[in-house]
Amino acid sequence: MSKRHSAKYKIDRRMGENLWGRPKSPVNQRSYGPGQHGQRRKQKVSDFGLQLRAKQKLKGYYGNLTEKQFSRTYEEAARRKGNTAENLVGLLESRLDAIVYRAKFVPTVFAARQFVNHGHVTVNGKRVNIASYRCKIGDVIAVREKSRNMALVLEAVASSERDFCEYITVDAKGLEASFIRVPELSEVPYPVKMEPNLVVEFYAS
């Protein structure tokens, strides 16, 4: 198990927020960060601190991306026309692991990354094992036939609610999803407030 994967339960505590809206999040039990000194009095945060925090939240939400992965995504967002903050969110939501998570084929974004990396997913009928693969509008994402009876998938599908994001269409029984358009920030169902505009300020400073 990677260090980034094993540290997922510390992300909520470090941020002081329940990033994924999980009932068992440690933030639900206490409102301070990890470590024995986590309960110190809060100090006023600088503009840079707010920007850094916004970046760490967004990185953490998508499976604790590495700085290299995240900065490359930001650079691509900055090169594109339009609002860089909106572009950044659109690119993150276009990741294959993000779409697998949004389609509720697996319970967490961490599980989605592992699921893709282990070759359980196809895009337009071809197996893709790169979690950061950038899906295009019209792409059809599906769970491979031989992977459909995995306990992870069956439990996720059985326990998930049937409401899905408006930018994907999902055939829950067929374990298939179509990426119909790149979302705007306001459409992404983040359980907590994300501030990609502060991320833009972080990289611009």
Curated annotation (Swiss-Prot):
Role played: One of the primary rRNA binding proteins, it binds directly to 16S rRNA where it nucleates assembly of the body of the 30S subunit. With S5 and S12 plays an important role in translational accuracy.
Annotated stretches, region: Disordered: 1-46
GO-annotated molecular function: rRNA binding; structural constituent of ribosome
Keyword Ribosomal protein: yes
Pfam families noted in UniProt: Ribosomal_S4 (PF00163), S4 (PF01479)
PANTHER family to which the protein is assigned, alphabetical: 30S 40S RIBOSOMAL PROTEIN (PTHR11831), SMALL RIBOSOMAL SUBUNIT PROTEIN US4M (PTHR11831:SF4)
Protein family per UniProt: Belongs to the universal ribosomal protein uS4 family.
A single Gene Ontology CC term: small ribosomal subunit
Subunit structure: Part of the 30S ribosomal subunit. Contacts protein S5. The interaction surface between S4 and S5 is involved in control of translational fidelity.
Identification of the protein by name: Small ribosomal subunit protein uS4
Keywords: Ribonucleoprotein, Ribosomal protein, RNA-binding, rRNA-binding
Domain of life: Bacteria
GO biological process: ribosomal small subunit biogenesis; translation
Positions of the S4 RNA-binding domain: 94-154
Transmembrane segments: none
